[in-house]
């Protein structure tokens, strides 16, 4: 399934039905009064979070969403039927903004959360509404009002507690695959991961914690280089970051600083987020080189370092123990 995390749509609420002019014309009612009914209200457009959806793919092919109009009023003071609300399903984690102003309308984070994004127009008034002591046969009635129409920006931010970040080819996808049931595409070249991968890792209590493998960052990502900040947004909601470094890289210390710089540049307090620093591919290092590299990375980051080999399954229990400690599990 194609992963789409941004969409632009137009929502158009229903128009209110017109009121009508009518008079009672019944046998034995020689002085029948006004009986024109009011129009029904137009339908609203409502977004609903659906926990079964993972992408905004549906909005790639359909972008206009009109709600039904209200029906016109009827004789005998009958009010027209109101238009049904149009319910649009979106994934949990969807932010909704006005397209041109950027104003945040809502953030649908839990399944069945609802957000009315366009209100239907009010129905018009029938002439029965204008009956008064001075005017016993009013001919006035009003048309229904137009519903609201808005251009919206939908933006999906994954609901993961733990985000796995690092430069391309650091081993993030391998790590999430061995920690969870996720099976991301894995190969030895940059940008294998082109979309975020989600995996559920079991806590000691048996409950699941969602981990997200975020596509590799590069220098300038916060300004849009490489895969850009299209996927940086997906770590905004995380409680903990796991920064994976490639132990076989030419200069892991420089790699560390590149990602640190991008987190600072992107903002949203990401650089202040609790973070575990992980050196992957431990099997590629001899003891002397490993000790030197650990000292250099800890000095550059001010953090302790966790050594693992995701491919060989080394150090994973210790890593998870630190994850649960940081999350307070």
Swiss-Prot record:
InterPro entries associated with the record: G_OBG, GTP-bd, GTP-bd_Obg/CgtA, GTP1_OBG_dom, GTP1_OBG_dom_sf, OBG_GTPase, P-loop_NTPase
Record-level Gene Ontology MF annotations: ATP binding; GTP binding; GTPase activity; magnesium ion binding
Domain OBG-type G, chain residue ranges per copy: 160-328
Matches recorded under PROSITE patterns: G_OBG, OBG
Binding residues annotated for Mg(2+), in chain numbering: 173, 193
Cofactor(s) listed in the protein's UniProt record: Mg(2+)
Major localization class: cytoplasm
Gene3D superfamilies registered for this protein in UniProt: GTP1/OBG domain, P-loop containing nucleotide triphosphate hydrolases
Family listed: Belongs to the TRAFAC class OBG-HflX-like GTPase superfamily. OBG GTPase family.
Subunit comment: Monomer.
Protein name per its UniProtKB record: GTPase Obg
């Amino acid at each position: 399934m194609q992963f789409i995390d941004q969409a632009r749509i137009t929502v158009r609420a229903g128009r209110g039905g017109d009121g009508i002019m009518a008079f009672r014309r019944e046998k034995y009612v020689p002085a029948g009064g006004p009986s024109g009914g009011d129009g029904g209200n137009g339908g609203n457009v409502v977004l609903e979070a659906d926990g079964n959806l993972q992408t905004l793919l549906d909005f790639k092919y359909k972008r206009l969403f009109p709600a039904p109009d209200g029906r016109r009023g009827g004789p005998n003071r009958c009010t027209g039927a109101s238009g049904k609300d149009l319910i649009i399903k979106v994934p949990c984690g969807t932010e909704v903004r006005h397209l041109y102003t950027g104003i945040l309308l809502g953030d649908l984070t839990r399944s069945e959360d609802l957000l009315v994004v366009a209100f239907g127009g009010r129905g018009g008034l029938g002439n029965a509404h204008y009956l008064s002591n001075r005017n016993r046969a009013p001919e006035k009635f009003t048309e229904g009002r137009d519903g609201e129409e808005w251009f919206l920006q939908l933006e999906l931010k994954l609901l993961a507690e733990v985000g796995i970040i690092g430069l391309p080819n650091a081993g993030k996808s391998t790590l999430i695959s061995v920690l969870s049931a996720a099976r991301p595409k894995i190969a030895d070249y940059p940008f294998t991961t082109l979309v975020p991968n989600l995996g559920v890792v079991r806590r000691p209590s048996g409950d699941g914690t969602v981990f997200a493998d975020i596509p590799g960052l590069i220098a300038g990502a916060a300004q849009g280089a490489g895969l850009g900040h299209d996927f940086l947004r997906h770590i905004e909601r995380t409680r903990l970051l796991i920064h994976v470094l490639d132990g076989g890289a030419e200069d892991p210390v420089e790699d560390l600083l590149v990602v640190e710089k991008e987190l600072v540049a992107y903002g949203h307090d990401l650089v202040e987020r609790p973070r575990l620093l992980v050196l992957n591919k431990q099997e590629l290092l001899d003891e002397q080189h490993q000790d030197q590299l650990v000292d250099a990375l800890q000095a550059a980051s001010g953090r302790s370092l966790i050594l693992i080999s995701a491919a060989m399954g080394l150090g994973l229990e210790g890593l998870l123990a630190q994850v649960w400690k940081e999350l307070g599990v």
